[in-house]
Amino acid sequence: MSPRVGVTLSGRYRLQRLIATGGMGQVWEAVDNRLGRRVAVKVLKSEFSSDPEFIERFRAEARTTAMLNHPGIASVHDYGESQMNGEGRTAYLVMELVNGEPLNSVLKRTGRLSLRHALDMLEQTGRALQIAHAAGLVHRDVKPGNILITPTGQVKITDFGIAKAVDAAPVTQTGMVMGTAQYIAPEQALGHDASPASDVYSLGVVGYEAVSGKRPFAGDGALTVAMKHIKEPPPPLPPDLPPNVRELIEITLVKNPAMRYRSGGPFADAVAAVRAGRRPPRPSQTPPPGRAAPAAIPSGTTARVAANSAGRTAASRRSRPATGGHRPPRRTFSSGQRALLWAAGVLGALAIIIAVLLVIKAPGDNSPQQAPTPTVTTTGNPPASNTGGTDASPRLNWTERGETRHSGLQSWVVPPTPHSRASLARYEIAQ
């Protein structure tokens, strides 16, 4: 028996309404019979229940979200597996039912946010991401559809479903690209490991869209957009924006992850500085303890390769002892060998492009997608040095009087009930 209205999972969670269908499962509004509260239940799709890889990914999602506890991260309450009348066991997550609206729906309705609301959203999101980054987790799919805003202006990040612990064995296939093309970091589009700086890049794209009303890169398909993230600089932001705001977004959208803010905390601190009227601080280029600095995105140009080769040769010469003037013969290649090397390089580049095309998601953020996965329970607070500073900037109350249209709500996000004291904000469009 497939999930349907009235089904009770594990004798406790009674499904009441289908909210959304995503890549891995369905999200239902349900009632917890034991505690008498409304919850969201994400049920793994039946066609994936017999697939060990999908089952493991679903379990990993539960473990990931169970590590985190922060007001800015939607909560997970429970995980379980339930027998479905002879169809085998089906896994599910029980999550916080968020009373809010996804940012992509807000932007669709308003065009862009006022500057003060955009900066408030970015700082809150950065501080919430820092909790995950301090725990060794990378979200890998930061986008407006995964950023919810409650009637009081509280930001909640959802859908850590493709997040993975940086130090854990990957569940996804080697080289698999995870993320959404419009918001993907260049290193992710190339199939490299995602880092906290990758989340910062994606959040920078969100910020670009929030303050300008458009995404930095557009194209006919996911591959085109992803290649622009890899190779092209973002178009200049509108000149009516303050210089420090433009500088903040420009820093987060550099191609080299080592040149960005290294995690959500330093980014949030930079946003706080901008909100206070100061210039954003330059990112620290010191890599996190125990990790090598990420490599720059390769440009594929002969000049870059030649410069790197020359630098390595010079360093090698300095480190070798004198050999009495004897120099080994210089290695040369025949024209046939050079042709083979050139062909191998072209084939390698084509392989990367094909991999991106096969696995990257659709370019838009409004198409049906996997339901966001809220997150919860941390085993203690991270050290103060990992929090990225204190949240000194006051959170704005985004609530205004009057009705708010709720179009395009996604995941398990629900509009306020008639008993809500405040309706969702009709966000001010920046002039």
Curated annotation (Swiss-Prot):
UniProt-annotated location(s): Cell membrane
Which domain of life does the protein's organism represent?
Answer: Bacteria
Q: Which residues carry this modification: Phosphoserine?
A: S10, S46, S75, S105, S198, S263, S309
Q: What results from changing T180S? A: 4-fold reduction in transphosphorylation activity
Q: Where is the active site?
A: D141 (proton acceptor)
What's its top-level EC category?
transferase
Q: Where is the Protein kinase domain?
A: 13-272
What are the Phosphothreonine sites (modified residues) in this protein? 8, 21, 64-65, 90, 125, 152, 158, 172, 174, 180, 224, 252, 302, 313
Recorded E.C. number(s)?
2.7.11.1
- Remarks, anything else? Overexpression causes major growth and morphological changes that indicate defects in cell wall synthesis and possibly in cell division.
Output this protein's name: Serine/threonine-protein kinase PknA
What organism, scientifically named, is this protein from? Mycobacterium tuberculosis (strain ATCC 25618 / H37Rv)
